[in-house]
């Protein structure tokens, strides 16, 4: 990966890394994608 909330220095962040947070919940990287599941920027 090159960009995305679950990418750091062209490598995937580990599964379970917080990729975005709201006041009521957190969403976590899967370790298999540079995109965050349910990330608002995903369209």
UniProtKB/Swiss-Prot annotation:
SUPFAM superfamilies: Blood coagulation inhibitor (disintegrin). Transmembrane segments: none annotated. Signal peptide: none annotated. Keywords: Angiogenesis, Cell adhesion impairing toxin, Developmental protein, Differentiation, Disulfide bond, Secreted, Toxin. Disulfide bonds join 1-10, 6-29, 7-34, 19-36. Expressed by the venom gland. Residues 1-43 form the Disintegrin domain. One of its GO terms (biological process) is cell differentiation. It is found in: Secreted. InterPro entries: Disintegrin_dom, Disintegrin_dom_sf. The keyword Ligase does not apply. Its main location: secreted. A motif (Cell attachment site) lies at residues 21-23. GO terms for cellular component: extracellular region. One of its GO terms (molecular function) is toxin activity. The keyword Disulfide bond applies. Monomer. Belongs to the disintegrin family. Short disintegrin subfamily. Specifically interacts with the alpha-1/beta-1 integrin (ITGA1/ITGB1). Exhibits highly inhibitory effects on cell adhesion and cell migration to collagens I and IV. Also shows in vivo anti-angiogenic activity. This is Disintegrin CV. It comes from Cerastes vipera.
């Amino acid at each position: 990966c090159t960009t995305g909330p679950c990418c750091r220095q062209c490598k995937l962040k580990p599964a379970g890394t917080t990729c975005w947070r709201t006041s009521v919940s957190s969403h976590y990287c899967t370790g298999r994608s540079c995109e965050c599941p349910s990330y608002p920027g995903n369209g």
